[in-house]
Amino acid sequence: MPELDRIDLKILDLLQRQGRMSMTELGERVGLSTSPCSERVRRLERQRVITGYHAQVDPHALGRTLLVFVEITLSEKSKSIFEAVRREIEHMPEVIECHLVSGSFDYLVKARLAAMADYRELLGSLLDKLPVPAQSHSYVVMEEVKDSRVIPVDGL
């Protein structure tokens, strides 16, 4: 893990919140001139602390108003089965997150879709393509209370 000082952490916090901030403004906010601030950002990119910059898109503007979480429990478990599941999930653009978890089920899937009919089709396709029988439990989101990608840097 790279060593990060107070200024690095402040840079990371600011860029997570506003990735298009100019180096001049970023430098002013962290107490550096533009050149040293740019050098720090490039170092953080080289060290893969900063892994990319992304536009935050309103899913409603694209008609993707349905957000669903799905628990998937596989009937059998092995490394090859987990790899097969990974390959199938990676080819499903509606699935925006998928996590192999510990606990009473195996995968937690987050999907963003336009309508319930799309979800029904996605779930049927997913369960059909899995290498072993599986059970699923779905949770349709009624309200997104908090949706943040900001990794807290306080206390580091």
Short names for language-model regions:
Residues 1-156:
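A compositional/biophysical signature of low hydrophobicity enriched in polar/charged and small residues
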